[in-house]
A protein has these predicted regions:
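Helix-loop boundary and gating motifs at the non-cytosolic
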Residues: 2-63, 239-283
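C-terminal ends and interior cores of transmembrane alpha-helices
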Residues: 90-104, 314-327
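Helix-loop junctions on the cytosolic side of multi-pass membrane transporters
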Residues: 182-207, 414-426
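Cytoplasmic membrane-interface "Motif A"-like loop-to-helix N-cap segments
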Residues: 78-89, 301-313
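Substrate-agnostic recognition of the 12-TM MFS/MFS-like secondary transporter fold
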Residues: 19-36, 61-74, 80-89, 112-168, ...
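Juxtamembrane intracellular "pre-TM" segments in multi-pass secondary transporters
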Residues: 1-17, 196-246
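Transmembrane alpha-helix termini and helix-breaking/packing motifs in multi-pass membrane transporters
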Residues: 38-46, 158-179, 269-270, 380-398
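Helix-loop junctions at membrane interfaces in 12-TM secondary transporters
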Residues: 101-113, 324-335
């Protein structure tokens, strides 16, 4: 049964699509080995830092993920996927080297959050934009996005599990060596990546074709800069589907921003487990997310829409309530799996909708605009998360955040039906 579920993405993807899946899997696994344990875990367990320090780490990281995504989107639109990928690899290796070299003092860890955030934001187009450089067929795009999501979620299993063992055997900072190892493996996997150009109109430059690059490879700077951020912002907010999607993701993720700075304290003070469990419970979420991505792969085309996305986001909220609702690690494990299943459906749905709606020559920057809404929604709650935790308690604050995450998509489904129907007809 399980083998039949996984057979479709393996048999239907092109060689270049499989290579793209491997690139994303390896570079994302490196990130997953290091962020939660290497940054938040070091602050909470090794440095015994406060909620304010972890909130600052998440704030810095989210802000620089936003900045990195804008830089990455601009680089992709100007130079194409192959050069963008090489820059992503260089940035990841430089980040790991810097964090290892400068020690584990709180200030250094916060700087590490900045570097890691920028690097992750810069590399995000690998998952969100590269598929559109391989095909413009909606069904094939859904298959590629589901496969990317599925193996990205395998990263959430593999990365934190390996990171947990390394942290238990050595230290929480040692996980950055793993990040660098997986980055080198990603470079090897991506060495032969060649985007397709046959479905892109208006890019007949011979040198660009030989390089296999798309969108803005002309030597004329004014040509490569034609898809400005202002144009991409206008594209998002003048298209009913993209505008609604931006608002849905922003509002639905608003409550979720309280989780990152408080989760490590939930593990330490409520579940009463060690730092390695931060990796292992994250891996449980990855198991669920793989199953969710398989479900997304099996969705019929008529369900690839904003209503299905809202149902999946509401399920994220319900899973988060189960995750943080009790002091029992076994229940938290089940909650993480449920939460992962929901996220496994959300991500490929979101990416497919964007890729089939936005113009290819603006796709990198359009995804940066969409990512800004997502990440800014996570930044805003950081200002009050420490106060809420001090006033009501860590677990109570997380339960309240889970209720917000559940209620927002439910309200949008009930109150925004007319707008959703109009967007579906576009």
């Amino acid at each position: 049964m399980l083998a039949s579920l996984f057979s479709k993405p393996q048999s239907s993807l092109s060689v270049q699509a499989k290579r793209l899946v491997a690139m994303r899997f390896l570079i994302y696994t490196g990130f997953q080995t290091s962020y939660f344990i290497g940054v938040i875990g070091t602050l909470t367990y090794a440095d015994d830092a406060s909620v304010v320090a972890t909130s600052l780490a998440v704030l810095f990281m989210n802000v620089f993920v936003i900045l990195g995504s804008f830089a990455g989107g601009a680089a992709l639109d100007a130079w194409g996927p192959r050069r963008h990928f090489l820059l992503s690899i260089i940035g990841a290796l430089a980040t790991g080297t810097a964090i290892i070299a400068f020690g584990s003092a709180t200030g250094v860890v916060l700087l590490g959050a900045v570097l890691l955030g920028f690097k992750m934001g810069f590399a995000q187009p690998i998952a969100t934009s590269y598929p559109a450089y391989l095909t413009n067929d909606p069904v094939e795009l859904k298959d590629i996005n589901s496969a990317i999501a599925m193996f990205s979620n395998v990263s959430i299993i593999v990365g934190p599990t390996l990171g947990g063992f390394v942290a238990a055997a050595a230290s929480s900072r040692a996980v950055f060596m793993l990040m660098m190892l997986f980055t080198v493996l990603a470079l090897i996997a991506g060495w032969g990546f060649r985007p397709q150009t046959s479905h892109v109109a208006g890019h007949a430059d011979a040198d660009s074709a030989e390089e296999g690059e798309c969108a803005g490879q002309s030597s004329n700077p004014s040509t490569s800069a034609r898809a400005t951020f202002a144009t991409s912002i206008k594209t998002v907010f003048t298209n009913s589907v993209l505008a609604l999607l931006f608002c849905i993701i922003f509002l639905s993720n608003f409550g979720y921003g309280a989780f990152d700075p408080l989760e490590s304290f939930f593990y330490r003070d409520v579940l009463r487990v060690g730092v390695e469990w931060m990796g292992w419970l994250s891996s449980a979420s990855g198991v669920g997310a793989v199953l969710g991505a398989v479900l997304a792969l099996r969705l019929p085309p008529h369900l690839v829409n904003l209503k299905t996305l809202l149902v999946a986001l509401m399920s994220v909220g319900l899973g988060s309530l189960l995750y943080v609702g009790t002091p029992y690690v076994g229940v938290a494990l089940v909650g993480q799996i449920a939460l992962g299943i929901a996220w496994g459906v959300v991500n490929p749905l979101h990416n497919t909708i964007v890729q089939t709606t936005a113009p290819l020559e603006q796709l990198g920057r359009v995804n940066s605009v969409m990512g800004f809404g997502n990440m800014f929604a996570g930044v805003a709650p950081l200002a009050i998360a420490p106060w809420l935790a001090a006033t009501f308690g860590v677990q109570q604050t997380l339960v309240g955040a889970g209720m917000v995450v559940t209620a927002v998509p439910a309200a949008l489904l009930l109150l925004g039906r007319w707008h959703l129907d109009c967007a579906a007809k576009q």
